Amino acid sequence: MANVQVWTGAEIKALRTAMRLSIREFAAHLGVSERMISKWEAKGSDITPLPVNQAILDTALRMSDPDTKARFKGLTGGAEISGAETIEPIGSSQVRHPMTGSPMVKVDGSIYQAGPSNTPLWVPSYYIDIYLVSNADYAQFVAATGHEPPQHWENGTFPKELANHPVVWVTWKDAAAYAKWAGKTLPTAQQWEKAARGTRGATYPWGDQPTPAKCNVRENGVGATTVVDCYQSGTSPYGVYDMCGNVWEWLDTQSTPGRRELKGGAWTSQFDRAVPSQFNDANETMCDDDTGFRCAAPAEDLERLLHGTE
């Protein structure tokens, strides 16, 4: 069976036809303008979309149901887009951040299924911390900057038994200050959710089966935070830990002035509150024993650092 190496307007029209969508519906599905779809289809095989749009189309085909894929192959003479059936590997493209040494994983740019309605959204490539920021990680920041430590640390020092537990009692501003010091950012709500659910839009990081035992939530009766690498069976498609339970995570996304989104649920949360697609927010000054964070970084920025081009 022939492989089409790149999309042209002809394959784009075939995909829209196979999906049985109007130009307006197809444009909304891809996250592009109706005018762009019309332009591609009008020029047929004489136009090739930009690489970012090639990736969007690859993802749209990969996520289509079997009947749509069969119709697409029929409309294109049995051809399929090269790489369209690639399954994203778990925990691939791991690196260590050059400043903090924390392990991060790359999440390639593509569409993912966002929110309770599974709306297709495009997110550019980025890296995200595999683990929550721990007390030991945060202590380096406090020592380097003189930032005020969390209120439960005695004499400015965290309890030794909590070294590898997520830092808590931090406001959004504390989390943002750490991220800036580390040369990172807080993840946006879209970045966080994509890393939790993968491009296929699983309900939970591990899949669609509700399994409270795979995370630290109220039903398990742990009654406190757990070490950041505890729940290996609950990792996301990218190998990221604790995207359900343990602690709520501060995000960069502002919901209203002075309030920021949080995701993931916590050890204090009921399991149904830990679903990654759910919305939650809080005042930036909120500070509690079940709220922490992890960091992210744009792919281009981190790769320049890693390759020594800055």
Predicted region positions:
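A short, Lys/Arg-rich alpha-helix, primarily the initiator
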Residues: 1-19, 55-58
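Conserved hydrophobic/aromatic packing and binding residues within compact polymer-binding modules
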Residues: 12, 26-27, 37-40
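Recognition helix of helix-turn-helix/homeodomain-like DNA-binding domains
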Residues: 31-49
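DNA major-groove recognition helix of helix-turn-helix/homeodomain DNA-binding modules
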Residues: 49-70
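Short, charged recognition helix plus adjacent turn
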Residues: 68-93
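A short glycine-rich, aromatic-capped structural motif
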Residues: 95-152, 169-173, 195, 245, ...
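Functional-site microenvironments in short loops/helix caps that host divalent-cation chemistry
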Residues: 105-107, 113, 148, 154-289, ...
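Short, structured beta-strand segments at or near domain termini in extracellular proteins/domains
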Residues: 289-305
